[in-house]
């Protein structure tokens, strides 16, 4: 119910994706049921600080901060949505880094953030990109690192799936639920959560 006001990836989004090979829509580009699962995880593990890497238009961070009112909320993004004609809308409390996460400037910014309970990595979906974001963020104080698109169901997300499958250290949780909003009885996205 808490997620009800927010549009997630639905049949319209899927049609855009199939037509243009990209989901260019101002919404949360995730499976609603999996976001609900993420919210359950956040509640169960008392997540009070959140960093999202790769935010599109900011829908997920708006929804999560709106529900959980994190003590610390931060985002890192290169602003791709703006180049596609969309506004990026973030809560006032958000600390934002605009630029590539593989830079000394990002590392300095991330270090200043300090401990983050949950880092959601949803930026570069290529294998080397997601691995790089994992390795960078693993260096800084955190409890959990999460990844979107672990199923690798389309050619744009196979790098995430490969990385997730190879990640054989620490503890892993998977949130993979049927994507009902597009009429599927299985997950084509998936959220993976990892801890040391």
Regions found by a protein language model. Give the residues of each.
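A short alpha-helical cap/connector motif
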Residues: 1-120, 124-196
